[in-house]
Amino acid sequence: GAVIAEVRIRGIRVRIVAMHLDLSGLWRRRQARAIISALEARRPLPTILMGDLNEWSLHGGCLRAFAAGFAQVPLEPSFHSRRPLARLDRIMVSPHFRVMASGVHRSATARVASDHLPVWADLELTDAHV
């Protein structure tokens, strides 16, 4: 599923989508298409997508649905927290953003808090923002 929020950052409206997609590849692809449809039904805004996509592929599967309008933020593996091998947790941004920095939080506390390590990105709105 997904949650969509619109917030104002320094007077600029930004859309944020938090997702936790299904374990099934078929359902993940359906969920991704539903999220894209929901976004297309709204006015265009600078948009950040993020969450546990449960997608093991680097660019395939449900990620294809997002690729036309969103760039993946470069991230290291964040799953499983004790021995990260997979990039299941993603951040994707519309062309309105420039990625200044990104990473995976690897503290001892993070390793026991969840089976996923937290991911983060420092983003800057470009001059092309809406």
Where are these regions (language model features)?
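Active-site regions of metal-assisted phosphoester/phosphodiester hydrolases
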Residues: 1-130
